[in-house]
Amino acid sequence: MTDSPIPAPAPAAKPKRAKAPRKPASHPSYSEMIVAAIRAEKSRGGSSRQSIQKYVKSHYKVGQHADLQIKLSIRRLLAAGVLKQTKGVGASGSYRLAKGDKAKKSPAGRKKKKKAARRSTSPRKAARPRKARSPAKKPKAAARKARKKSRASPKKAKKPKTVKAKSLKTSKVKKAKRSKPRAKSGARKSPKKK
């Protein structure tokens, strides 16, 4: 009798777990619906999340969790740069399409997105020279520091002048003291002459 393990039927169960293909949604993706809602509203200050939700619910057949899905897809569109937030912070506020996205449509939009991605690389290249310009600003800052130091150096030069003035005063005092002993010496000499 051998103790070899008997193969378990578990691997055969895995193919049964395969999910059935999803049913096609009765509406386009939430990001497309949001873009359509913002285009339809055409407000100058941007569209609020509430107005986007109203538009989506009235024009498309969406489920119970549409509000959450709209909120999440707005965040994704903001991160992707498709939308810009004009007012507010986070999920609250107003949104509008970025300038390049107004002409996009769903079938041709993907091709344009690829082109936009290529365009986005070229502004990044342009941003690199800007970074190169910033070191040019640093020498200006160093020059400003040098100017400050040069301004500080005359103050140091002024201090020796004050010391000189003090030395002049002390020398004058010494001269005056010397003159007094001379007078005394003259007085001493005069009695000897008598």
Swiss-Prot record:
Residues 26-99 form the H15 domain. GO terms for biological process: chromosome condensation; negative regulation of DNA recombination; nucleosome assembly. Keywords: Chromosome, DNA condensation, DNA-binding, Nucleus. Erythroid cells. Residues 1-12 have a biased composition (Pro residues). One of its GO terms (cellular component) is nucleosome. One of its GO terms (molecular function) is structural constituent of chromatin. Belongs to the histone H1/H5 family. Histone H5 performs the same function as H1, being necessary for the condensation of nucleosome chains into higher order structures, and replaces histone H1 in certain cells. This is Histone H5. It comes from Cairina moschata.
